[in-house]
Amino acid sequence: MAGLLLAGCGQPAGIDGTLVDDWAPLAEPKPFVPPVGVCHPGGLTKVAPLSSFDPVDCATGHRTETVHVGTFAEGAAGRVAPPGEGSPEIRTAFGECDAKAREYVGNEWRGGRLRLGVALPSPEAWTGGARWFRCDMAELTSVERNGDVVSRTASVRDALKAPSSLSLGCYSVRLAPDRSLREMPGVDCAKAHNSEFVGVWHAPETGFPTKDLDWIRLYAECRKLMATYVGAPNDVNLQFRADVVVLVAKPDEWQGGDRGVRCYLWLYQGTVSRSVKGAGLAALPIPRR
């Protein structure tokens, strides 16, 4: 029995006695990076920890969709914690998300009832090496009056490539007693309306508009879009034919890089029952006082 045990401890032919020297080295563990084109049951968020990653089929009920995933560049990547709200790094990330979102939906996403947000890794994931930022998109019931997030059952990919139910169109602007904007519900362009979405102006890197001079610039740029939309000259008489409604992002979103300004034509008097797009000056008579 002893001889058998000793024989069992010997080295078989061709074995050098070192068990691991011929094994391939283990791959360096890599941080989780979220995929593009997946949908999520939760709403827009600023932090997306791995524990909350629970994607669903975009054909089933969901509230957000990832349209792009980017990587922070060297400067931001060297930080010990994720970039803070409104930081230059977040503005740069939003700019990339903005461009990629337009490609994803097939057009300017602000031309639809859509909202874009940037989600970052958790502080723990950042410490572990995660340097991604996630660009998520949600459909809203309204972009004009801080609408709620809609539960969708289809992807937003190419959703604005052609006019669709998501597209911004015609509205019925209603004023409060003090002449301020009370509401502007969307209506069928074939029915009576006094306002139409005319386009988006991208403001430069400036602070959130607070002074009259700031707003004058925004109104002037929106009038240019209105003139192009209608097919009318952008002259001194245009402001007497129609006004504009200007919609900007919230101050914190503006500081975070969302400088897209939605512009709407607004008729001073009366209504129309067809779109004024391309209709020329005849569609915008100077109202009688």
What is each residue range found by the language model?
Residues 1-2:
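Sec-dependent N-terminal signal peptides
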Residues 10-289:
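Primary mode marks residue(s) on the alpha4-beta5-alpha5 output face of response regulator receiver
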Residues 5-8:
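C-terminal motif of bacterial Sec signal peptides marking the signal peptidase cleavage site
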